[in-house]
Each structure stands twice: as C-alpha cells, then as structure tokens.
Curated annotation (Swiss-Prot):
HAMAP family: Phosphoglyc_kinase. Pathway: Carbohydrate degradation; glycolysis; pyruvate from D-glyceraldehyde 3-phosphate: step 2/5. Disulfide bonds: none annotated. The gene is pgk. It holds the Pfam family PGK. It catalyses: (2R)-3-phosphoglycerate + ATP = (2R)-3-phospho-glyceroyl phosphate + ADP. Belongs to the phosphoglycerate kinase family. GO terms for cellular component: cytosol. Its EC number is 2.7.2.3. Monomer. This is Phosphoglycerate kinase. GO terms for molecular function: ADP binding; ATP binding; phosphoglycerate kinase activity. One of its GO terms (biological process) is gluconeogenesis. Gene3D superfamilies: Phosphoglycerate kinase, N-terminal domain.
Length: 400
C-alpha cells in the first residue's frame, strides 16, 4: 500500500488552497460533542498544513441528511470543539460548493482554516457525481485525504475529487495504510488473526479471506458457537447460527487446505443468565449444560491463545472473545489483550486492531494505547480485512 503520495510529496504549501477531507462524524448530544477522538486525530495534519502557510479547507460529512440540507446534520456545532482542539480560530462556510463556499474561501489568508458545511447536503456526494466533484475541486489547488474511515465508499469527496486534483494521503491516512501493510500485505510471519463478535453471518467474507492469508486464526465470541455446533458439540442456549453450520465447515476445510491453524475454544465460561456477575462455571466445550449459555472463553482456551501469540510476530484483531461488557465475561478478552500488549511493548509483536467493539474492548482492557495500531475506521477496516479494494485508497494509488 506504499504506492501513494503523502504530504511529503506535495511541495511548498504556502498560499495553496488545500482541500482536506476529514472524518468529523463524532457523537453529539444536545448540540455538544461527547467524544472528540476523531477531531483530535486530524488536528496534527491541519496544523502541519496551516503552519506551512497552506489555506486549509475542511470537507466532511455528518449523519445521513439524504442529499439536502437538514439542520440536525449541520457541521456548525462542531466548530467550537474543533477550534478549541486546534488552538486557533476556524471559519465556517455555509455551503461546500457554489458562491457561499467560494466567497468564504476567497477571504482566507495563508495559514487560515475553514470548515465547509456537510458534503452530504448535496445528492451528488453519495452518487460520486462528476459535476459535484468538479464544483468541489474548483475551490482547491491540491487534495489531501485524511478520512480512511470513509475510504470504502466511492463518494465525490473521497473518490472522484481525488482524480481531479493532485492528491495526497494525510498523516492519519498514511499511518493507517502503513499499519495495514504491516498487518496483512507484507507482514512479519507467523501471522495470527483473532476474530470474535456475535455472528458468523457478518464475517463470512472476512474469515474466507483470512484463512488464505494468516498462519493461525482464533475464532471467539458468539461466532465460535456456530463452529462448535458444526463440529457436533451441544452449545446449550448459547447464541448460535445453526443454519450456518455448512458455511462453518467450508471455512474449516478451506483453512486445512491453506495450512491455516484454526483455534477454537476448548473450554467456556457459562451462565444461565445474561447479566453482570451471573452465577457461572467453567466447563469443557463438549460438556455445556443444555440450559446454559457460553459467555466467554475459559482458562485453558486463554492459555492456548496466549501460547499462539507467543509464536506469532504479527497479530490482526477484530471482535471480542466474549460478552466483555459484562463482568466476569470480559476475562478472556482482557487477558489476551493484555498479553498481546506486553508482547508489543517488548518489540516482539506487531499488533493491529480495529472495529468499534474491538476498540471499546481494548480500551476496557486498558491497552488501547499499547497496540502498534488501533484503527477507528469500522467499515473500512472490515472491508480491508475482507480483501476488498477501497475506492478512496485506490484513487490516491492511481496518482502514486
């Protein structure tokens, strides 16, 4: 993935109008930003361009306004948080194209920053409409994409626009692509993948792609129950997609053919109620009581997974190993995450993780900062794991 241009290749930015596509889709409550993580992550790139004398023009989407203005999806309420995190004033453009945008941009001086209104206020954004992309391009000299989280969508501000102007990856995009290259495209082997979460149905493509690329694949969470069921084990009242038993068997057969070792739970923490601190016991997976649910992996499974991580040089993680939001069913996820973090800190493992639940689980384990890279891009990270091309990245690569 290194065949794309970065800010290092952009030349002098003094006086240049830089269209910077960012992801500002932050959670809001009562008109206030409740989690500024995505804003904080783009601040260094904004500062770098502004400090070099570039005129920073921020493009972003927010919510799903269906191609026309909707006050509840305005980017304006984000302005104060953005300005505060940036430590400098940020102007606002009432539209992202047309006269309102052009006049606001014309007033910028070198080093100024402006946020333009929601790109999704125009139907042309999600349709990847060439005319809308041209209208966006008219306001810039160069284009920088800093929104990996939107890279799996072929929209005008992520794909068509990148083909109309000299296009570069921002620092966040660059870090994400470098991490993903180390994770699967050119990894240090052996590679281990941990895939958890509730359902096999949402991760069939991902599992089929991974068995061909990794040396060891740990399957945990609710989805492991479907595989255990496919092997003829009784999983009691556990979450289980019994209709996908044949799919599970197919994935197991493909893994065998590709010499990928599948690691399934050998024991489980079971309970009869789905609630925190429910009465529980650890049992072998072939002795799950008929009235109980599997809610986490057991101690022997944790030891097996930790042992596999000891052998690996690269780890790719998506999805928790159990119902981590309920104590004590977070034990497996926390123990394995902390073990991977220790190996990473000791320089023995490159660890890449992503997906909403995964980020929350790692933060819960207190190791969100200790992995080599944690991707905040849910859908784009999953599509990359599935081996799909990401339009926003391909558009940058085309110019690389």
């Amino acid at each position: 993935m290194t065949d794309f241009r970065t800010l290092d290749d952009a030349g002098p930015l003094q006086g240049k109008r830089v269209l910077l596509r960012v992801d500002l889709n932050v959670p809001m409550e009562g008109g206030r930003v409740t989690d500024a993580t995505r804003i904080e992550r783009v601040v260094p790139t904004i500062r770098e361009i502004a400090d070099a004398g570039g005129r920073v023009i921020l493009l972003a989407h927010f919510g799903r306004p269906k191609g026309k203005p909707d006050p509840k999806d305005s980017l304006k309420p984000i302005l104060s948080t953005l300005s505060e995190k940036l430590g400098r004033p940020v102007a606002f453009g009432e539209d992202c194209v047309g006269e309102a945008a052009a006049s606001a941009i014309a007033a910028l001086k070198d080093g100024d920053v402006i946020l333009l209104e929601n790109t999704r206020y125009h139907a042309g954004e999600e349709k990847n409409d060439p005319d809308f992309a041209k209208a966006l391009a008219a306001n810039g000299d160069i284009y920088v994409n800093e929104a990996f989280s939107a890279a799996h969508r072929a929209h005008a501000s992520t794909e068509a626009l990148a083909r109309l102007l000299p296009a570069y990856a921002g620092r966040l995009m660059q870090a994400e692509l470098d991490a993903l290259t180390k994770g699967l495209e050119a990894p240090a082997r052996p590679v281990i993948a941990i895939v958890g979460g509730a359902k096999v149905s949402t991760k069939i493509d991902l599992l089929e792609n991974l068995v061909a690329k990794v040396d060891m694949l740990v399957i945990g969470g609710g989805m492991a129950n479907t595989f255990l069921h496919a092997q003829g084990k009784d999983v009691g009242k556990s979450l289980c997609e019994k209709d996908l038993a044949e799919t599970a068997k197919r994935i197991l057969a493909a893994a065998k053919e590709k010499n990928c070792t599948i690691i399934l739970p050998v024991d489980a923490l079971v309970a009869r109620e789905f609630k925190a601190n429910a009465e529980n016991e650890t049992v072998p997976v072939d002795a799950v009581p008929s009235d109980a649910m599997i809610l986490d992996v057991g101690a022997s499974s944790i030891a097996t997974i930790d042992g596999a991580i000891e052998e690996a040089r690269t780890l790719v993680w998506n999805g928790p190993l159990g119902a981590f939001e309920l104590t004590p069913f977070d034990t497996g996820t926390v123990a394995v995450a902390q073990h991977a973090a220790r190996r990473t800190k000791a320089g023995q493992l490159v660890s890449v993780a992503g997906g909403g639940d995964t980020v929350a689980a790692l933060n819960h384990a207190g190791v969100g900062e200790d992995f080599s890279y944690v991707s905040t891009a849910g859908g784009a990270f999953l599509e990359w794991l599935e081996g799909k091309e990401l339009p926003g990245v391909e558009a940058l690569r085309a110019q690389g």
